[in-house]
């Protein structure tokens, strides 16, 4: 049983909580891992790697993430979200045109300071551990990229206006911090009210299954399990000859005539089973394929 599960994580549960619950319905020999932590207050797509799928994580964890976020204007939070201590600001009228102007400032590459309530390490401790002790330390800004930032809806009728955003961004982007920083630019303060991850790479919310569905019946796990090659289908596929199998299985390179445009490929057995991921290096008119992950999926 090797592959991926596209879990729709509920609120009030950590990403590790999801892993712990799945471990109860899987044989112990299968490793589990997730692609990208979701905060407890967030819901939505949490891809979980099963068995040999955990060995594919390094190749896909940098994929683009998409979120639907609601932010509240006119207040701030010590955690930058609705679960923290809220401080209300002096009411200030915000014009819709001003919002669009500010959003434009955050599109593209920028540097973002991670929040104190985060799992980032500082001198051997997680930042949230220090924050719970009432400490605040200087954090290094990290480069992020916002590919798309779209205003979906604005509710100006409430005492504290709310904005709904669609955010497509790089790995490591804190949506809480994005909302906080937008509030700072608007001059009114803001915090994240709700968050849903709608996509993580090729994993989409429309195809996600609930954790309860998986736990309810063992056969549901098999139904929901996506193939091992699901998140790497964008890589070129090469079908190996029987004579080439021993070399790949033992981590040795092979040569193929002709050049490849992609630096990385998928290698399959003659029967169509994924065997390895390989680095493709062109030399003259040939390509050398060096396996960097070999899957022993029959174990």
Curated annotation (Swiss-Prot):
Gene3D superfamilies per UniProt: Pseudouridine synthase (3.30.2350.10)
Enzyme active site: 39
Catalytic reactions on record: uridine(55) in tRNA = pseudouridine(55) in tRNA
Enzyme class: isomerase
A Pfam family: TruB_C_2
Top-level division of the source organism's lineage: Bacteria
Any one GO MF annotation of this record: tRNA pseudouridine(55) synthase activity
Keywords from the named record: Isomerase, tRNA processing
Signal sequence bounds: none
Its biological purpose: Responsible for synthesis of pseudouridine from uracil-55 in the psi GC loop of transfer RNAs.
HAMAP family: TruB_bact (MF_01080)
Family per similarity comment: Belongs to the pseudouridine synthase TruB family. Type 1 subfamily.
Protein's UniProt name: tRNA pseudouridine synthase B
Organism: Syntrophomonas wolfei subsp. wolfei (strain DSM 2245B / Goettingen)
């Amino acid at each position: 049983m090797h592959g991926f599960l596209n879990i729709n994580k509920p609120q009030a549960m950590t990403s590790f909580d999801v892993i712990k619950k799945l471990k109860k319905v899987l044989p112990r020999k299968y490793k589990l891992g997730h692609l990208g932590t979701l905060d407890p207050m967030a819901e939505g797509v949490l891809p979980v790697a099963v068995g040999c799928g955990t060995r594919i994580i390094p190749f896909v964890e940098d994929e683009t993430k998409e979120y639907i976020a609601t932010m509240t204007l006119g207040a701030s939070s010590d955690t930058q979200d609705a679960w923290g201590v809220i401080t209300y600001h002096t009411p200030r009228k915000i014009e819709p045109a001003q919002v669009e102007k500010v959003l434009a400032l955050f599109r593209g590459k920028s540097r973002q300071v991670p929040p104190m309530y985060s799992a980032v390490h500082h001198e051997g401790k997680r930042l949230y551990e220090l924050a719970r002790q009432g400490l605040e330390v200087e954090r290094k800004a990290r480069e992020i990229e916002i590919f798309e930032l779209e205003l979906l809806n604005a509710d100006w009728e409430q005492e504290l206006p709310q904005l709904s955003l669609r955010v497509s961004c790089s790995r490591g982007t804190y949506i809480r911090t994005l909302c906080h920083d937008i509030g700072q630019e608007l001059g009114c303060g803001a915090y994240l009210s709700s968050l849903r991850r709608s996509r993580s790479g090729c994993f989409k919310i429309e195809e996600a299954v609930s954790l309860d569905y998986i736990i309810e019946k063992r056969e549901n796990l098999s139904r929901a399990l996506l193939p091992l090659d699901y998140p790497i289908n964008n890589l070129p596929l090469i079908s190996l000859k029987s004579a080439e199998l021993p070399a790949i299985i033992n981590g040795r390179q092979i040569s193929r005539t002709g050049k490849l445009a992609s630096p990385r490929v998928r290698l399959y057995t003659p029967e169509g089973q994924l065997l390895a991921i390989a680095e493709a290096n062109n030399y003259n008119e040939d390509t050398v394929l060096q396996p960097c992950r070999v899957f022993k999926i029959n174990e």
